[in-house]
Amino acid sequence: MARWSKTIAAAAILTVVLLVVAGCSSRSLTLDETKWQLAEWTVSSLKPSDFTITAEFANGQISGNGGVNGYSGPYKAGPGTAFAAGPLAGTLLAGPEPATRAESIYQTLLGQAKSYKVADGKLTLYDQGGNESLIYEQATR
């Protein structure tokens, strides 16, 4: 009888451990129906907060404002933390030099993003080397 109790207890513990591990496995976090405002980037002395740079995700599409022009195109998040955006299309408005330079930097970094993480109200995109490149804060709808 004691042997069966130990077997049942071991099976119960194993089940709990497997459920915990399965819950911690890498799953794709959906970005659909979220909107973000760019807060930081790691490659320029220009401050993203000086411009309106946004990203909105819905139905497999990313759209937003790059600082001067609107943009849109397909994106893919997953499997796991994999990320890809593009090809992107945009309007062709002219703008002041700092804003057009910021937009160019943004478009380049967005196109180079290979993975992502959502945590603490922030969306972080990483380049191929795993370096943070674009850091957004969740925007209100």
Where are these regions (language model features)?
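Lipid interaction determinants
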Residues: 2-141
